[in-house]
């Protein structure tokens, strides 16, 4: 993404050329938009709870606060593996989830039988989720990629709290809803298996984006 910001700066410098400015009709505004990737989900949820933001993505939040109200056309760019590519492929939409397991702490060597291992619950949940993958249609392009952001506090203590974050992506809204329900079911199953509790917070992400082919005049200008 550092390269994308460099591209914005390069475009701004190019548009200061007097010959270029003569050909422009209107005004050009440059946005350095944060939070495209929608990471750090729990942190963003805390900002939402505080009323500081409503959406976890930079473009969504800028739209909400009116930053694009007087914009007629926007041009975005992204790094890729080609010298130049005009237009875009369709993009998955997604919801974000924070999964919090609560167990019971105990000494991992002296009395593990007195504890409820939240990390074991999370491991079972991840395994259950993996077994859902064959139920996803290829055409729906479902992608679910969780991470563990908190796995325990001390190595000699049975973990009593484990936190995961994940995005649930798919190419259409029905597929997102289906995959999200299966994700919840899998993670809750892990909690049931070991007697832990499971709390899942789901937040809206992006809707699927359907792209049209680039206009011929745009392709010619890009050349």
Map each language-model feature to its residues.
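Acidic/histidine-rich catalytic neighborhood of metal-dependent amide-processing enzymes
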Residues: 6-90
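Active-site His/Glu-centered metal-binding helix of metallohydrolases
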Residues: 3
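Zn-dependent metallopeptidase/amidohydrolase metal-coordination segment
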Residues: 223
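Midchain, well-structured core segments that form catalytic/ion-binding scaffolds
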Residues: 68-216, 220
